[in-house]
Amino acid sequence: MNILSLGEKIKKLRKEKNMTLKELAGDRITAAQISHIERDKSHTSRELLEYLASQLDVSVDYLLETKEMQSKKLTDNLILQGEILIKCNDLEKAEDQLNEAIKICDEYKVLDNYATCNFLLADINFKKGKYSESVMGYEKALYYFIKNNDKDKLYKCYLNIGKIYMIEEFYKGAILQFEFSEGILNEIQVEDVDIYKDLYSKMAYCYIKLDNNEKSLDYINKMDE
């Protein structure tokens, strides 16, 4: 799917139908006016758009769809494909899809999807054992998730960074990330106790590794509450 301006769409459709400028213009406007529209040098009225849409056998909504709207739709689709490929463990193809989506998001400022792409690429790098790249991806995503107040994604970012720090035996850093995760869980009032238990077990483990048995016991007790 190419991302096209209004003029580019009209020109592409006209060429596909082998219509000349004069044929598309008909008795409604001049060929010169159509040429201006195709070069995005002229504004069009709703009435004229309805005429052009009928001549080109498309909807007015299609013609009115902006580059930003098209880029959102295209990156939504690439992200969905990427998520499916990750679930199928086809990580290389998933990475290709998401990198393509990131380029489009960056060019057209589709910030929500830009954050999601970075999050999913971080997941891929986590699975590959590329921990530094993974943390960088989660941190990029965090910036936008914080701006959008996306609590669910924030929780997952902090949790996964904490898991990576555990693997790397950076236990103080892991605890800090898990504390951020715990704060979000409390804020959104998650009812699934198993989510809390899983988090508390990780925190207890980190405190044991830091020889802080008292804090470790606190979190072990929390698991039984």
Predicted stretch roles:
Residues 18-37:
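Short alpha-helical DNA-recognition segment
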Residues 72-73, 112, 152, 194:
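Residue signature of alpha-solenoid helical repeat architecture, marking inter-repeat boundaries
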Residues 47-62:
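DNA major-groove recognition helix of helix-turn-helix/homeodomain DNA-binding modules
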Residues 99-106, 139-149, 179-189, 221-225:
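Amphipathic alpha-helical segments of tetratricopeptide repeats
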Residues 1-16:
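A short, Lys/Arg-rich alpha-helix, primarily the initiator
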Residues 76, 116, 156, 194-198:
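Residue register of alpha-helical TPR repeats
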